[in-house]
Swiss-Prot record:
Keyword Cell membrane: yes
SMART domains the UniProt entry points to: Alpha_adaptinC2, ARM, B2-adapt-app_C
Alphabetized Pfam families for the sequence: Adaptin_N, Alpha_adaptinC2, B2-adapt-app_C
Phylogenetic classification of the source organism: Eukaryota, Metazoa, Chordata, Craniata, Vertebrata
Gene for this chain: Ap2b1
Entry's Gene Ontology BP terms: aorta development; cardiac septum development; clathrin coat assembly; clathrin-dependent endocytosis; coronary vasculature development; heart development; intracellular protein transport; kidney development
Any one Gene Ontology cellular component term annotated for this protein: clathrin adaptor complex
Segments for region (Disordered): 593-617
Protein name as it appears in the record: AP-2 complex subunit beta
Modified residues (Phosphoserine): 4
Modified residues (N6-acetyllysine): 265
Amino acid sequence: MTDSKYFTTNKKGEIFELKAELNNEKKEKRKEAVKKVIAAMTVGKDVSSLFPDVVNCMQTDNLELKKLVYLYLMNYAKSQPDMAIMAVNSFVKDCEDPNPLIRALAVRTMGCIRVDKITEYLCEPLRKCLKDEDPYVRKTAAVCVAKLHDINAQMVEDQGFLDSLRDLIADSNPMVVANAVAALSEISESHPNSNLLDLNPQNINKLLTALNECTEWGQIFILDCLSNYNPKDDREAQSICERVTPRLSHANSAVVLSAVKVLMKFLELLPKDSDYYNMLLKKLAPPLVTLLSGEPEVQYVALRNINLIVQKRPEILKQEIKVFFVKYNDPIYVKLEKLDIMIRLASQANIAQVLAELKEYATEVDVDFVRKAVRAIGRCAIKVEQSAERCVSTLLDLIQTKVNYVVQEAIVVIRDIFRKYPNKYESIIATLCENLDSLDEPDARAAMIWIVGEYAERIDNADELLESFLEGFHDESTQVQLTLLTAIVKLFLKKPSETQELVQQVLSLATQDSDNPDLRDRGYIYWRLLSTDPVTAKEVVLSEKPLISEETDLIEPTLLDELICHIGSLASVYHKPPNAFVEGSHGIHRKHLPIHHGSTDAGDSPVGTTTTTNLEQPQVIPSQGDLLGDLLNLDLGPPVNVPQVSSMQMGAVDLLGGGLDSLVGQSFIPSSVPATFAPSPTPAVVSSGLNDLFELSTGIGMAPGGYVAPKAVWLPAVKAKGLEISGTFTHRQGHIYMEMNFTNKALQHMTDFAIQFNKNSFGVIPSTPLAIHTPLMPNQSIDVSLPLNTLGPVMKMEPLNNLQVAVKNNIDVFYFSCLIPLNVLFVEDGKMERQVFLATWKDIPNENELQFQIKECHLNADTVSSKLQNNNVYTIAKRNVEGQDMLYQSLKLTNGIWILAELRIQPGNPNYTLSLKCRAPEVSQYIYQVYDSILKN
């Protein structure tokens, strides 16, 4: 008879009977009684009153009975901590039992009893088990240390268990090694700064040796540990990859994904032009494809991970697109994932196959899948320009099916295609308008309204179409209302005489009858714009639209890099970092991809998580591309006594918050105007997306002896009709100066000098007019010191410290660019308190930390600290670790950004390691350049 009989009893008063049976002299009776107790406990009955009687049954040689008693103990020890102490002697005795299975069982149960009162009694038995002659006992004891650490971390450290764990990494048994690694990794997760694992080439070699002989779980533990190691160079990275690659052919999909994670991380360190790099990319494809032949649930997990891999390195699977074609019997969750990856892999070479598949999918019966397929056709058109016409034709065929949800989704994606390829496919608008009456979804209605408004001049009855939407204005969603408002304003600007009544009607509905603040605000903006300056309104509302990006749903680069570090875990399925869904008392250590140390000369950007990925993204909406155009379009009239600024024009532009609006209306400050009449600059709110990053602040200063970059020629005479300008930037008495030398190499004299800066990353502008009062005669030079401040408008530049300047004289207007060395923007109050420094360092995410090498520097730590302090870089603390001098430093920029630094100096080694952390990591490479310049001059 099976053990199910223990779960079928309905007796009353059975506790008393069980108590008697537990104390029976016969072993079999006691064993039966314990089974009944466990069964009662399993179904939720309270049998805690039997605790002392069950504990008495521990004194037995029967392994099955001992397991049952231990199970009972684990369940009730927390609610009966005082009685749990009764079992301590039995644990100690069992840990010395000749049977290794009993020793291991005892130590495993010890780790599972989470009672503070008895942990101290368990230290000695655990210490013996960690050095036990039997590997099964040692591997069980290793896991017990991690469990004990979670209960009482301080005691584990004091008792030296962590050192014992580290010793087990060199154990002769691979499973002991794997469990020791698993335990140390878990402890390290909760104490990220402890460096418990102490990964070095020797330990890594031991782990790789154990890898081949472990069980599947052991291999996963070791591979996960390897993924946290940063090899010292690409040769070591390649060596590890060669020994991990065989795991790709493992039968267990978890082992395969763990191996892929290691290889994806180490690919960052391999030179991209090497044969091995390309060979490794080819080796990664087959195992990923094989994962898609498993069960649907395994396929889904594999596809979610492949989605990340394809975003990071699409070249791995670019030849394997057919395996992502949907099968008729795939579950919907697998179909949607495959569809997403298909689009990511779509290219000119395979677009015909992809489109044929998508058209077929669009005739399926599953509504969600069909919608996604139609949307995918639009994404193909946007991504692969050569296929756009074929995609539009396919969408028109689908619209002809008259299936409601297909038509609506098709109209939404055609709107995006119009945005991507303006004035190319407008001939299909008539076909779209035929389906107006069938549109009942907000997205589709908004898309159709946008199309009618954008191409109103090509649609004869555009006013009637928009008026039909206006009839139920208050019943529409906010999205449709906003789109309709803009569309009617566009229509009015294109056909003012015919639509005046219509535009007044929609403005009245938006501003007077609506409770939605967004709608009201937009209505008021349009109303004031139209009534104040219709010409400007036309320029604003009908301006050329920025192109839409090819991939709108790519994961943000730094998050993608973090998720690559979590391949094979729940984070890679959710596409969220662990701290977004795991609550822990210690928090979660953020991971990031290793930094390639191939090039660290001054001026080079580190190939890190932030810098590379941002540079690789296609920049569709320009952030500074038109800025030089802004300077070129400046209307520079002759110098006047008082600079005129058109308040009406500037007001209109400010109202619309244009981040790229031109500098028209901001006249030059001529040199003839006395400083007292110069307009005082006011901080401008610029819609550039950087206001939070670059908060404008005042107060700058530099200690005497600060570094000054050598003068450079900014404007050669051959490009400026004989005017040559060279210069640099300095800090004196707490002010920033632009030190310039003007040389006249022309044959005529020069007068009426004026200067203006374009918007820049730090809001740098002249504090006073350019003061050159006497004519500059041929072959004459003059030195000019122009005071600057940081109160001007902010616009992110590329590079970040780029400054675009316009200089005018009686001959012409000339333009040049120069780079501001960031040390002139370091402020005097950049010294942090020690506690604040420590808290801030921990608070800034680890992916924001970038490392650089400062080469060929022969200064000691004190000299370095003194030199940097002269430039407002303050040393907060200094300590010596294993012969290395560690300087912890802080500095602050004029816009309020704090940068924290750790500088490692090894006496006798001319190469210093600089680690920088700040909330705006794009600044770090420029700070590194400043460090390099200061310490080498």
